[in-house]
Each structure stands twice: as C-alpha cells, then as structure tokens.
Amino acid sequence: MEQDVVAQTTVGQPYTAGTWVVQSGQEDEFIERWTAFTSWAKREARGALSFVLIRDVDEPTRFQSFGSWESAADVAAWKSTPEFMLYLGRCRELCDDFQAANYAVASVITS
C-alpha cells in the first residue's frame, strides 16, 4: 500500500466506492478490467489519487473498490466522460450485482 497516500488523507476528502458481485468464473477477467479502468483513471482523470480493490476471503466473487480523490468536482468530471461509462460498463457486464457510493473521510488514524 502506498503509505504516503494514507498519510496525506484528510477529513472530508472524497472517496468513490463500489461493491461488486462478480459472476462465478469471471473473477480474473473482472480484476483485469477493473485494473484497466482504474489505470486509465489514474493516468487521465484530474485529481485521481489512488485506487484499491479488495476481495472477500469467504465469498471470493465479492469485491469492494475504493478510489481517493482531491475534490468532489474531480469525481464529477471523471464520471461525466464517455470513457468512464465505457470502462464501468466493461466491469459491470461481468457482475451479478453492483452498487456504487460516494463517501467523504470522517476520521483518519495513521501510525
């Protein structure tokens, strides 16, 4: 994990999140597509800081994703691009369920 990103996290900082339930047998393809999606975002989207995808150990078709951003305006601009819908759609077509959410950091504890 990029320690410097965590250390720079501040209260109120925007995060995007997704809960993904992937079709059985499609997990590796989903990880590849999600990685392409977020690699594009990191390169091209203003204010994109970091992305992480975590997998449920007990239910391996269930994933959570998080993206940290400089501002809510950056998130809105990212979501308004045609590429966003294309990449998101490629991930979603491998899923039985997907829920998106927008968050703001409420508390930060670092070592």
Model segments located where?
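Glycine-rich beta-strand-turn "strand-cap" elements at beta-sheet edges
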Residues: 1-13, 50-61, 87-111
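An amphipathic, aromatic/His-enriched active-site/gating alpha helix that lines ligand/cofactor pockets
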Residues: 2, 36-49, 68-102
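Short, well-ordered beta-strand segments in beta-rich or mixed alpha/beta enzyme
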Residues: 14-21, 50-79
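Short, surface-exposed ligand-recognition loops at beta-strand->loop->(often short) alpha-helix junctions
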Residues: 21-31
